[in-house]
A protein has these predicted regions:
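Glycine-rich beta-strand-to-loop/alpha-helix junction loops that act as flexible
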Residues: 188-189, 218-227, 256-258
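Short, Lys/Arg-enriched N-terminal segments with co-localized hydrophobic residues
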Residues: 4-16
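Feature marks short, surface-exposed loop/turn motifs that line or immediately flank catalytic pockets
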Residues: 149-151, 190, 226, 260, ...
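N-terminal capping/small domains of soluble enzymes
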Residues: 14-92, 98-101, 288, 336-341, ...
Length: 395
């Protein structure tokens, strides 16, 4: 009970240090202290387990924060030529790159900005490996494997579902890997536990174990949510150490994305209208689920709103509606201690990963600003967006 009191007291104290009135609306705000907490934990796991942990840009690519990230983790994983270039230019290191399919036009750029390139299929490997050799680069090539096992329950995020386009299944490989394949890569997790990884590793060894003595590295992909409060970090470290004891020659690579930015910031919005239809009250905000919080609708999941709860009978209760023309751009319900009013601020928690990298400008809705609340409790504006950003997307 005392520890719970301390946690609640700390949360109230942290909120009080952030002057919401200084922040434009809508705005994504990342908190530097929380980011550093995550980075410290990830670096500790990396060092204690003796593995290489790199940042997955597909979840978090807020490059103006990379000077902070570089203090802890200097490498990243990319899934396109643009992400690979961002890694090279802004993080200062070549990327570990994987894509479901490379093109003739893009592959020279992939080679320029990458240290590792993973191919999704044997046909892609055979098509592009001659370009790797002809380039004379020191890029290390790998194959993505599909262990046909995943604990992910949402089909949208399950790369091992029957018929998946992701990775090579064991029945397509013979007794040896093609010449030039130096590593294997699997990605089966999504905000998962170390026990999910343990079960996946067992399947990887069962199906692909014959190749492990002959490759240099094994990339375990992303989805390792090691910064979540209930994640068993000690079990993860023991699991990785045990695997390394069986395969001491292997470099083990992990590429989480959400874990870096988990619970590190929020989306500040403002109530701009309140409407009622058949007894359902909807507070319309100056942001959008479909434009600015797309995973809420895709997963779907209901985000937390600061100082709000799930619906409670007898309390002021609302749907929250996005400010787009999409009928389904809403979620709910939430209850508040007092009725909402136009002009009230609503703070959507944990909105830094898989948000900024996925936003769009549907309906010409203004994009939220980007900001950092730094470790000295100052607001640092990274970017504001305007009409030209919308117009130039279609130039």
């Amino acid at each position: 009970m005392f520890s719970l009191y301390l946690h609640i007291h700390y949360e109230i104290l942290r909120y009080s240090m952030i002057d919401i009135n200084k922040i434009p609306s809508p705005c994504y705000v990342m908190e530097e202290k929380l980011l550093r907490n995550n980075l410290s934990l990830i670096k500790s796991v990396k060092e204690r387990a003796g593995v290489n942990i790199i940042l997955a840009f597909k979840a978090f690519a807020l490059w103006k924060a990379f000077p902070i990230v570089r203090e802890y983790i200097p490498f990243s994983t990319a899934s396109s030529k643009f992400e690979a270039r961002l890694a090279f230019e802004e993080l200062g290191s070549p990327a570990h790159t994987y894509s479901p399919a490379y093109t003739e036009a893009d592959f020279p750029l992939i080679l320029r900005y990458s240290s590792h390139v993973t191919f999704n299929s044997l046909s892609q490997f055979h098509r592009f490996y001659p370009m790797v050799r002809a380039d004379g680069s020191r890029v290390s090539c790998g194959l993505r494997i599909n262990p046909e096992y995943s604990d992910v329950e949402t089909d949208l995020y399950n790369p091992c579902a029957p018929g998946s386009r992701m990775g090579v299944t064991c029945d397509l490989l013979g007794d040896t890997l093609p010449e030039g394949v130096e590593g294997l890569h699997f990605h089966t997790l999504c905000e998962s536990t170390s026990y999910d990884l343990e079960r996946t590793l067992a399947e990887v060894e069962r199906r692909f174990g014959r190749f492990l003595p002959h490759v240099k590295w094994l990339n375990m992909g992303g989805g390792h949510l090691m910064t979540r409060k209930d994640y068993d970090v000690e079990h993860l470290i023991a699991l990785l150490k045990g695997f390394k004891e069986r395969y001491p020659h292997l470099e083990l690579i992990m590429e989480p994305g959400s874990a870096f930015a988990w619970q590190t910031g929020f989306l500040l919005t403002t109530v701009v209208d309140i409407v009622e239809n058949h007894g359902v009250k909807t507070a319309i905000i100056d942001a959008s689920f479909t434009c600015h919080m797309p995973d809420c609708l895709e997963m779907p999941y209901k985000p937390a709103i600061r100082f709000a709860t799930d619906a409670v009978e007898g309390k002021p209760t609302y749907r929250i509606g996005g400010n787009s023309c999409l009928s389904g751009d809403y979620m709910g319900d939430w209850s508040f201690d007092k009725p909402l009013e136009i002009g009230d601020k609503l703070i959507f928690e944990d909105m830094i990963h898989y948000t900024i990298v996925k936003t769009n400008m549907f309906n010409g809705i203004p994009h939220p600003s980007l900001a950092l609340w730094d470790k000295d409790d100052r607001l640092v504006m990274y970017r504001t967006f305007g009409y030209e950003d919308y117009k130039n997307r279609m130039d």
